């Protein structure tokens, strides 16, 4: 089996997990990596003045790139995981080669769905994942005891990175719906993982969720940039609490036939993101994208 080394900047983080799902050998030495899985804003700032880096930067971000345009290096070997990231970087003159989606490695515990809702996420700097909203809204409907919160806010039942893969999928499969209410996602892996076991997302229909999820969408009512300080400015979307209440009520009163149809639909959609047995060859993916572009211009 081919060994591909992937640089990630952290250990208990989604980038580390992504590298494992893609079948890569993790390294924290950027000069030794063939692929760099990182937030592109942070990567292009961190290595702004270092020339001898040759990895393919495969990134996704929730930062507003416009706010960092004068701090970022030009980097040709750069792909993103979502189309909204692609458009954002293209607008500031740092055009990625293409979009290459992330992948999942689902497990399928044989358990009944004995919970209503689940959410999973780690909010940093501010509650970007809307974990507190999940806690509050499920209490409002008196279903907090039928809700699983995995995270670091919102009175979580489990810490984000404390679970094994089997434990995580055991929680996914127990829930009927995934509350994907994050204000911004560069890609949005957890609800796709949940879809693989038939758990239906109730999701904010924006950012990475809009292009990757299916289920019960809630359209955004506002879009803006939130700066928590001079160094951290995020592109965020807001949802209507009224529409959220409507969809939760819809979920609570949904017929068995409607739910089973939706569950089958989301499970089928998730198969688009399944990882292969071999380490993911991002160079092959880039070659295929180039051929598709060439055919489109003929």
Model-identified regions with their sequence ranges:
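Short hydrophobic beta-strand element within catalytic cores of glycosyltransferases
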Residues: 200-203, 210
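A charged, aromatic-enriched C-terminal amphipathic alpha-helix characteristic of glycosyltransferases
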Residues: 235-246, 253-288
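Short alpha-helical donor nucleotide-sugar binding micro-motif in glycosyltransferases
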Residues: 170-175
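N-terminal pre-catalytic "stem/leader" segment of glycosyltransferase-like enzymes
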Residues: 1-47, 241, 276-286
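Conserved catalytic-core segment of nucleotide-activated headgroup transferases in glycan assembly
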Residues: 106, 113-158, 163-165
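Aromatic "clamp/platform" in nucleotide-sugar-dependent glycosyltransferases that forms part
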Residues: 183
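Donor nucleotide-sugar binding/catalytic pocket of nucleotide-sugar-dependent glycosyltransferases
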Residues: 76-88, 93-108
């Amino acid at each position: 089996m081919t060994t591909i080394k992937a640089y990630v900047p952290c250990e208990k983080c989604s980038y580390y997990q992504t590298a494992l799902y893609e079948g890569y050998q993790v390294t924290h030495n950027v000069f030794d990596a063939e692929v760099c899985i990182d937030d592109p804003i942070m990567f292009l700032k961190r290595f702004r003045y270092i020339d001898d880096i040759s990895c393919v930067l495969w990134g996704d971000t929730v930062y507003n790139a416009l706010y960092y345009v004068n701090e970022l290096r030009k980097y040709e070997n750069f792909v993103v995981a979502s189309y909204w990231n692609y458009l954002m970087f293209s607008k500031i003159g740092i055009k990625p080669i293409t979009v290459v989606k992330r992948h999942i490695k689902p497990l399928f515990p044989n358990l009944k769905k004995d919970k209503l809702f689940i959410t999973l996420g780690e909010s940093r700097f501010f509650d970007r994942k809307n974990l507190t909203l999940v806690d509050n809204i499920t209490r409002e409907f008196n279903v907090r005891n039928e809700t699983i919160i995995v995270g670091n806010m919102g009175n979580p039942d489990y810490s984000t990175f404390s679970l094994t893969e089997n434990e995580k999928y055991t929680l996914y499969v127990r829930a009927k719906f995934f509350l994907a209410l994050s204000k911004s996602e560069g890609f949005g892996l957890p609800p796709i993982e949940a879809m693989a076991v038939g758990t239906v997302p109730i999701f904010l229909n924006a950012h990475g969720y809009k292009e990757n999820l299916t289920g019960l969408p809630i359209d955004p009512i506002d879009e803006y940039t939130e700066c928590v300080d001079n160094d951290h400015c995020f592109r965020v979307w807001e949802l209507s609490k009224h529409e959220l209440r409507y969809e939760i009520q819809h979920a609570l009163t949904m017929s068995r036939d409607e739910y089973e149809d939706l569950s089958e639909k989301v499970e089928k959609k998730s198969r688009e993101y399944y990882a292969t047995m071999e380490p993911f060859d991002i160079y092959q993916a880039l070659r295929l994208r180039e051929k598709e572009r060439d055919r489109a211009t003929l």
